[in-house]
């Protein structure tokens, strides 16, 4: 059986890829480059290259909920995306398509259904992503991570599977090479691509942070902003004591993320649902900085969900300053004992078996279609 996996969200896709049983092989369709017009390879391309999984790069436009200056140029790319999807699927000849959200999944899912290929999609958010809303009428089954998502999809299609990304992160967690230092450790992550806004805020208060804390900072590798290079120069300009306290990295291996979070007194992060769920399961305090441009304010809702569990605070990057950021970080670390998950629920434990549930769904749909 051959599965075409569409990114989207990389971490849950990887979790399923790495647990496929014998007799199943997979290809991956996604973005080769991190940002449009950038030359840096995307994390999904690097991950597939490292695992020797065939990768197909698809160029298409984004379907947007609101009209922006990018709407028309983006729409003009859609026909190309559908044509590429048709050519790819004719070459790949998959038995099943498994989509993990994201705009790349739209043309592949629709064209695949037109070609008679069964489609399964996975929704990892608390509500529903725009791409999956579009694909839902075409999908044979819809795997959801949260009970709150079920009401957005037809009851005969929705299957509660949990989030495979989280289960995989804990399963593959390994001790990180960083040893515990004398000072409390602050871990700063900006998502798989990094965050220029977070990087700039941290840069503005870096020396104040390093006077009190060890800092592990994941910047991403954008060639447009070159944050890693600039911050590396700043690190080299610091005195030897502060320089030693600052660990700079472009990426954090997904296999390391649980142990990295465990080593932290506090995490500063975007509010992606995988990160939020992982932090909840670890009972780890965090200052979350929602991406203001996320669809349907998805990250803000994730951040509010996290704060309701009494594990963190929310920082607004559009009005926040480096000085304000430092003040909140400092206060949270000093009051860390006041942050603990007081609303632990059984729902969080459903993620543990999600990989197998999704694979079982894929096998069920493939067999049903072939009959």
Model-derived segments and spans:
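Glycosyltransferases and closely related glycan-assembly transferases
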Residues: 84-98, 104-120, 133-137
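An amphipathic, basic-hydrophobic alpha-helix
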Residues: 60-96
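C-terminal alpha-helical cap of glycosyltransferases
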Residues: 350-371
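Acidic donor-binding loop of glycosyltransferase active sites
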Residues: 94-96, 261-275
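Conserved donor-nucleotide binding/catalytic region of nucleotide-linked donor-dependent transferases
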Residues: 313, 318-350, 368-370
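Conserved nucleotide-sugar phosphate-binding/catalytic loop shared by glycosyltransferases and other
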Residues: 5, 25-75, 316-318
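Active-site-proximal region of nucleotide-activated glycan assembly enzymes
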Residues: 25, 54, 113-174
């Amino acid at each position: 059986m051959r599965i075409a996996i569409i990114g989207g969200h990389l971490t849950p896709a990887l979790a399923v890829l790495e647990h496929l049983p014998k007799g199943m092989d997979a290809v991956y369709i996604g973005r080769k480059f991190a940002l449009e017009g950038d030359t840096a390879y995307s994390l999904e391309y690097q991950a597939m290259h490292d695992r020797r999984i065939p990768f197909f790069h698809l160029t298409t436009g984004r379907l947007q909920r609101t009209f922006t200056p990018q709407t028309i140029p983006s729409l003009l790319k859609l026909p190309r995306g559908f044509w590429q999807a048709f050519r790819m699927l004719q070459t790949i000849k998959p038995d099943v398509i498994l989509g993990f959200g994201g705009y790349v999944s739209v043309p592949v899912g629709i064209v695949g259904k037109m070609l008679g290929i069964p489609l399964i999609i996975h929704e990892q958010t608390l509500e529903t992503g725009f791409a999956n809303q579009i694909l839902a009428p075409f999908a044979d089954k819809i795997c959801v991570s949260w009970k709150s998502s079920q009401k957005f999809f037809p009851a005969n299609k929705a299957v509660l599977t949990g989030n495979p990304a989280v289960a995989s992160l804990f399963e593959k967690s390994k001790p990180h090479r960083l040893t515990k230092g004398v000072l409390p450790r602050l871990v700063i992550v900006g998502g798989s691509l990094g965050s220029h806004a977070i990087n700039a805020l941290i840069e503005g208060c870096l020396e104040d942070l390093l006077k009190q804390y060890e800092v592990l900072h994941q910047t991403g590798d954008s060639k447009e902003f070159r944050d890693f290079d600039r911050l590396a120069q700043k690190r080299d300009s610091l005195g030897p004591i502060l320089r030693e306290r600052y660990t700079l990295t472009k990426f954090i291996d997904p296999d390391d993320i649980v142990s990295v979070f465990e080593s932290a007194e506090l995490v500063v992060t975007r509010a992606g649902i995988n990160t939020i769920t992982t932090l909840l399961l670890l009972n780890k305090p965090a200052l979350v900085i929602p991406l203001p441009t996320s669809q349907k304010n998805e990250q803000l809702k994730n951040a509010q969900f996290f704060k309701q569990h009494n594990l963190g605070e929310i920082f607004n990057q559009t009005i926040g300053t480096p000085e304000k950021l430092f003040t909140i970080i400092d206060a949270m670390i000093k009051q860390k004992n006041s942050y603990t998950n007081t609303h632990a629920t059984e729902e969080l434990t459903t993620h543990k078996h999600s990989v197998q549930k999704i694979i079982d769904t894929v096998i069920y749909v493939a067999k049903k279609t072939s009959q």
